Amino acid sequence: MVEPLLSGIVLGLIPITLFGLLVAAYLQYQRGNQLGL
């Protein structure tokens, strides 16, 4: 009974985590450009 809920949570968290990492990398890249690296 718990497995479908758990898999749903995991499937929901994976895209959010990937999106968060993408945003963090993008912001770091932008900051690096501003510093002239």
UniProtKB/Swiss-Prot annotation:
Compartments reported by the entry: Plastid, Chloroplast thylakoid membrane
GO cellular component: chloroplast thylakoid membrane; cytochrome b6f complex
GO biological process, one term: cytochrome complex assembly
Keyword Methyltransferase recorded: no
One Pfam family this sequence matches: PetG
Domain of life: Eukaryota
InterPro entries: Cyt_6/f_cplx_su5, Cyt_6/f_cplx_su5_sf
The protein's role, per its UniProt record: Component of the cytochrome b6-f complex, which mediates electron transfer between photosystem II (PSII) and photosystem I (PSI), cyclic electron flow around PSI, and state transitions. PetG is required for either the stability or assembly of the cytochrome b6-f complex.
Subunit structure: The 4 large subunits of the cytochrome b6-f complex are cytochrome b6, subunit IV (17 kDa polypeptide, PetD), cytochrome f and the Rieske protein, while the 4 small subunits are PetG, PetL, PetM and PetN. The complex functions as a dimer.
Stored NCBIfam families: PRK00665.1
Name assigned to this protein: Cytochrome b6-f complex subunit 5
Native source organism of the sequence: Pyropia yezoensis (Susabi-nori)
UniProt lineage: Eukaryota, Rhodophyta, Bangiophyceae, Bangiales, Bangiaceae
